């Protein structure tokens, strides 16, 4: 989540630490955990499984954001295996999506630990290590006033008060003090460029995530 005034939280989908690609434990995943249906279209990556937690099948998730409220709020997680090069004759179940219902979850020393139905022992929890955690956008908690989820800002057109199109939001940067919109644009010479616009009240005039429009006090020549 990002807040337009302070912007202290990192965007939800910006990885802080990447998994190191360690081989997973040789534990076949139960068929009941594998997800064969088409994945929901509104899935958002919110973290990855860093380790097993305890001996009763709990998993430890490293969130991609300081604010883990969306991860804690969702009761169903999709666990997708990251691309891994060099695996020969790997267990096919490793690559299949896993869908789990979360019985309980809580924050723990900068991580989120969770108990997933169907994951009953440490060996099975370790077999999930490295998988990315995805949840549906529809399962995010409602943001506070003047707060926005970064995923809702991506793809918004950005224009100024004069009606001049500045570009389209392609990403966000957290400089520690506030968020900065990365706005993809076309330069006068026809080449692709980028504008960096602080996501703060001094420059923001309106944000319409439903209409995918942002209006800012910003000139074409800035």
UniProtKB/Swiss-Prot annotation:
GO cellular component, one term: cytoplasm
Species: Cupriavidus necator (strain ATCC 17699 / DSM 428 / KCTC 22496 / NCIMB 10442 / H16 / Stanier 337) (Ralstonia eutropha)
Gene that this sequence comes from: rimM
Biological function: An accessory protein needed during the final step in the assembly of 30S ribosomal subunit, possibly for assembly of the head region. Essential for efficient processing of 16S rRNA. May be needed both before and after RbfA during the maturation of 16S rRNA. It has affinity for free ribosomal 30S subunits but not for 70S ribosomes.
Domain-related comment: The PRC barrel domain binds ribosomal protein uS19.
Name used for this protein in its record: Ribosome maturation factor RimM
Keyword Transmembrane helix listed: no
Renumbered residue ranges of the record's region Disordered: 1-22
Location relative to the cell: Cytoplasm
Subunit structure: Binds ribosomal protein uS19.
Keyword Endoplasmic reticulum among UniProt keywords: no
Swiss-Prot/TrEMBL keywords: Chaperone, Cytoplasm, Ribosome biogenesis, rRNA processing
One GO MF term attached to the UniProt entry: ribosome binding
